Regions:
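Glycoside hydrolase catalytic-domain context in secreted enzymes
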Residues: 1-748
Length: 748
């Protein structure tokens, strides 16, 4: 294809019906209406008819597709834009004739697996891949051009199926992290999801409607029609690194948020619409019940542990029930598998004992088919987490690749497998059900042949479910978007202003002895010292320079010498651990610099050796700075960026005022500090009081239950740890306030 698709889309307007957009596909006229010729027959077929229900069209169209075309649609994987770096060292882009698609072969390798991949045109035409994950961070017009080009290539295939480009969320501020927060800063940038929760608690649920509507309009304008978003997981183990991305620890609040978020993004409360964006809710049945923070991206974190009776249904399932009730288009199971040996009895929605089969949740029929579908009433499709066939195949390691595909799709009920384009495994799983493979090969112990092969029935079920989404989104009729309109929509200053307003509303005032706000009268002609603290010292220096630049021009005098200052403003941005790899010990939550902490053994128990951990470089200097400022009769203000439930005891006692943000814009925090905006946010998560409430014994059991949210942990804590108010878990500051769920001060 030599032409740029965006410049050659032809549109056909239907009265009281959808616009049909095409670059090269035949258009059928019938009853005075226009329909796209999906199967290339040149004749009207019922599945061409946009007047029919999406599910009906999908079930009819799946019968037309070849076996290989259907198998290809079982898989979704990362894909690259030619104009933007693909992350593969040494890769040389070979553009197609349009100058948009990368048609070079590439050897792709990441933490999810390894694969030799063709160019984009070949992937779409010959492999018939139709589900791609975008991790690049392009401009909206480049994104629309690229997606348009993908659809135009797909139109040249005998059977037209549009290309579904999927992304993790793009509308929150924060540090970009592969596989978690791939892109930020292009689409309207709201605070992190914890900040959204903090603002909702302070200002009401209405802002979620605005947040969702912004996402829907921006994504639809650019042609992005599905998002891996958002997380209905509850924070119950504070050491879980994916606390970032959740809406906190309160199941009721998560349910309330999702009851507005899903319909707002998808376009209705009954599923997706043509101007909506499909939502994939993560990570069923909740990833918060970790075993002392270990993450299932690596082997030590492969278990979900429910040590508290009934915790699964009480805390972890409600958000997913709301997702099912609101018509979420798809749900993503977590990598982990449940531990029967380490868990107390858990019940399903009907009060029956749950089968805690030791299979990853994407392979776990009792959870996916029995609980989620039959009892919770979920009607969308199941989209696995990325890498379940290769590096994160917890519980089914004894199966080979084709058997894992067959077991996930045929037995557990997965409809879309994220990771690599494993169509060859899918074909082998399909053929093994027909070629007598298991007449000469042993069936792995504990499994049955019919569980491990890919049946026609399971294949059609899975593909018809994903096709239903594409039909409902209107992508068969018109998948094309105007790049100029995409750029205009995403740059709308009203959305950016609204997002900034929520940044301000997300700020939580944790401590104040009358220091805040820093009014004109307080700071006029005063000397102010400002510094940023990070885990990385070099990053802290750069951030400090920017902070000081932002503070120039005020009524006060900036000084780089804290010994002479009247006020200090300290911005604290701690971080801990790695997303995809295990730490030597338990994930550190203390604000510390080279703190000796225990290693863990291969079973996840504390060992006798130690190593040094840093979450906030130079944190010990806060005490020195405070001593000097207080000696001058001055005040120290701190702001803590909460991405995890930090232990704040090494900083809070030295601060006269303390605010908290959640990947909140620094300018919004300064608006609160200087009295330009009154703080209204409330904590969406409890901050633990210290290491003593997170201690793990020699059996690997934490003193505070990892499957219970912070607000309820005191019910299960030893009496010896409780204070005179019966509280053990939450941090209590020097003013006597507990930093627990929903806490936040006001300025009167």
């Amino acid at each position: 294809m030599a032409k740029k698709a965006s410049d050659h889309v032809k549109y056909y307007n239907n009265p009281d019906g959808p616009v049909i957009g095409t670059v090269s596909r035949n258009i059928i006229e019938r009853d005075g209406l226009y329909f796209k010729d999906l199967d290339g027959s040149g004749e009207y077929q019922p599945f061409d008819d946009w007047r029919l229900p999406a599910k009906e069209r999908a079930k009819a169209y799946v019968k037309v597709l070849s076996t290989d075309e259907k198998i290809a649609q079982l898989f979704i994987s990362d894909w690259r834009m030619g104009k933007y770096p693909c992350g593969v060292e040494g890769h040389q882009v070979v553009f197609d004739e349009s100058g948009i698609l990368d048609d070079a072969w590439v050897h792709g390798k990441n933490i999810f697996g390894e694969q030799h991949l063709p160019g984009t045109t070949e992937l779409i035409k010959d492999w018939f891949a139709r589900h791609l994950i975008l991790r690049a961070n392009p401009t909206p017009d480049d994104l629309a051009d690229w997606i348009n080009q993908l659809h135009a290539v797909a139109e040249e295939c005998p059977h037209f199926v549009p290309v579904q480009v999927v992304s993790n969320s793009r509308n929150e501020n924060g540090e970009t992290v592969f596989g978690m927060n791939d892109a930020a800063g292009v689409f309207a940038s709201w605070p992190g999801t914890l900040g959204i929760a903090a603002a909702v608690r302070g200002c009401g649920i209405g802002l979620v409607d605005d947040f969702a509507d912004c996402i829907r309009r921006e994504w639809d304008a650019a042609g992005l029609k599905k998002g891996y978003m958002y997380m209905a997981d509850i924070i119950s183990d504070p050491r879980w690194q994916r606390s970032y991305g959740t809406f906190g620890e309160d199941p009721k609040l998560v349910c309330e948020i999702f009851s507005h978020l899903i319909p707002g993004i998808q376009g209705s409360s009954h599923g997706v619409t043509a101007d909506g964006v499909a939502v994939t809710v993560k990570h069923f049945p909740g990833g918060g019940a970790r075993e002392n923070g270990f993450d299932p991206h690596y082997e030590m974190g492969q278990w979900n542990v429910y040590r508290t009776e009934g915790s699964l249904s009480k805390y972890h399932l409600p958000g997913f029930q709301t997702a099912a009730d609101c018509g979420a288009s798809s749900i993503m199971p977590y990598y982990a598998k449940p531990s029967k040996e380490k868990s107390a009895p858990q019940t399903d929605k009907d009060g029956n004992a749950m089968e805690l089969e030791p299979w990853g949740f994407a392979y776990n029929k009792p959870f996916i088919d029995g609980l989620l579908r039959r009892q919770m009433g979920f009607e969308g499709y199941i989209n696995s987490d990325t890498g379940i066939v290769h590096n994160m195949a917890w519980g089914v390691e004894m199966l080979d690749g084709p058997e894992r595909v067959g077991f996930a799709v045929n037995q557990a009920g997965v409809d879309l497998i994220s990771g690599l384009f494993d169509h060859q495994y899918g074909r082998e799983a399909y053929d093994r059900g027909r070629n007598g493979y298991y007449d000469t090969h042993a069936v792995p112990e504990g499994f049955k042949k019919e569980e491990l092969v890919l049946t026609e029935e399971a294949l059609d079920r899975a593909v018809s479910r994903t096709l239903t989404e594409l039909f409902a989104l209107g992508m068969f009729e018109n998948p094309y978007r105007d790049p100029k309109k995409a750029a205009q929509t995403v740059s709308d200053p009203r959305d950016w202003d609204h997002a900034m307003d929520v940044h301000r509303k997300s700020v939580v005032l944790l401590k104040n002895d009358g220091t805040l706000p820093l009014s004109r009268e307080k700071i006029k002609q005063k000397k102010v010292y400002a510094e940023c603290f990070y885990k990385d010292g070099e990053r802290a220096k750069k951030a400090t320079a920017k902070l000081r630049e932002d503070l120039k021009g005020g009524l006060f005098c900036l000084t780089e010498t804290y010994e002479e200052a009247d006020y200090a403003i300290l911005m604290l941005y701690p971080s801990s651990g790695e997303y995809f790899s295990a730490t030597k010990g338990y994930l550190e939550l203390d604000l510390c610099d080279e703190k000796p902490v225990f290693d863990v053994d291969t079973e996840g128990r504390p060992s006798g050796t130690t190593h040094l951990e840093t979450t906030l470089k130079g944190v010990k200097r806060i005490r020195k700075i405070a001593h000097a400022i207080h000696g001058n009769g001055g005040k120290v203000i701190g702001n803590l960026n909460i991405t995890l439930a930090w232990e704040v005891g090494s900083a809070e006692p030295y601060l006269d005022a303390l605010t908290a943000g959640f990947d909140t814009e620094q300018s919004a925090v300064l608006d609160v500090i200087f009295g330009r905006f009154a703080p209204v946010g409330k904590l969406p998560v409890t901050l633990p009081r210290g290491d003593e409430v997170l201690a793990v014994d020699q059996q690997g059991v934490c003193v505070s239950p990892n499957d219970v949210p912070g607000y309820d942990k005191d019910k299960y804590m030893p009496e010896s740890l409780k204070d005179e108010n019966g509280k053990a878990y939450a941090y209590r500051d020097t003013a006597g306030n507990y930093y627990e769920l929903n806490f936040g001060l006001c300025i009167i």
